[in-house]
Every structure is written in structure tokens, then in C-alpha cells.
Amino acid sequence: MGPQLIKYFKMKQKLGQPIRNDGPKWQIEAKKGTPTMGGTLILLALTVSVLLWTDIYNIYTWLILFITLSFGLIGFIDDYLKLKNYSFKGLSGKIKIIIQSIVAFIFCYLLIVFSEQSNTQLLFPIFKNLYLDLGYFWFIFGIFVIVGSSNSVNLTDGLDGLAIVPIMIVLATFSIISYLVGNAIYSDYLNITYISGVGEITIFCAAFIGAGLGFLWFN
């Protein structure tokens, strides 16, 4: 499906991704005509894999899929505007952060409402009984972490997999963490808080890594 999507994007985009003129000339020339919206391929492969292999009755499956696809949609709109105006300027930074913050707030709210073990406490690894109750500030903290993490990826983004490789490294780390936290035996042995059902995030991370590797093959 990858080659077909790439051909479709090339046909529709024609001129390809708008390139900034502040880089080396050889790089600007080499990248002319490069299609954008490659994240569509990643999200499509990820969504199919998650729906096939994760527990669809697990609340964490839907929450993490919701925020991933929501932020993916924001990126899609940003790329679409760049192509429409053929400019490297898409959504303004202010509008993008506002939309991201709204999505992050909805995610945090749903996490509190639908997850039985979720609360406003910030837990510290290894120190099992050490925690800080953030109260309503927990929402601000959650929004800051989610939006900040998303935009830190944007800062490293490029045309040669500069963003997806660090993402896969982080995903590999979180897959281990979610597995240990979601396993009653290992979490007790390592003196970390056990959260029932969160192990499904491990499958999500693995699916995301696989989708990222597939993206790199065509990148």
C-alpha cells in the first residue's frame, strides 16, 4: 500500500513539499518534489494494527488512539495548508497550540473519568509510596507534558526520518515501562505502582514502531 499512497501523493501534490531556503543549496535541490503527509501512512498502519491486536475493551487502547489520531489530524491540516498555499507556513503556532491544548485537556478529562485507577497524584518511580497530589493543577501539568512532547518532535522534524527515529526510541522505552507497570508481579518486584490494563500500551508502542520502520523504508 505504501508505494500506491506515495504515487498518489506525488500526483496530487505535484510540486511536493515546500522547502525552506535557509539550508544548503544541494539539499534544497535534492529535496524538491518530495511529497509530504507521510504521517498518513504511519497512522493508517498503526490504527489497523492496534484494532487487530489490542484489547478493544481496554480504555487505554481508545484513549491513546484518540490523542494520537487527533494530533495526527492537526498535522494533516497543517500540511494541507502548506500545500494549498505552497508555503512552509501552515497553521499558525498560536492556533496550533490552542487546538493541541484543547485535545490534551479532553484526553486528561477522559482519563480521569473512565480509568478506575487514575487520579490527580503524580507518582515517583521506585519510591512506591511517594507521590504528590497536584489537584486541579494536574490538568495543567498533563496538557504541558502532552503539548510540549508533541512540539519537541516538531523541532527535530526533517525530510530524512529525523523525527521518526527518536520517536521509535521513546516508544521502545515506553513499551518496556508500560509492560512492567501493567504486570502485577514485576511492578511489585521493582517497587513501582501497578496499574491494571496499562500493559495494552505495550502493543500500541510495538505497532507504532513497526509503522515507523515501514515509513523509513519508503522515506
Predicted features, each with a name:
Residues M1-Q13, L44-L73, F107-V113, S118-L122, ...:
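Alpha-helical transmembrane segments
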Residues K31-L43, K94-V103, I201:
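Select subsegments of transmembrane alpha-helices in polytopic membrane proteins
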Residues T36-M37, L73-F88, I143-V145:
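Cytoplasmic juxtamembrane interface segments
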Residues I77, L81, I102, L159:
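Active-site His/Glu-centered metal-binding helix of metallohydrolases
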Residues K32, Y57-L65, K84-I99:
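Membrane-interfacial loop-to-helix junctions in multi-pass inner-membrane proteins
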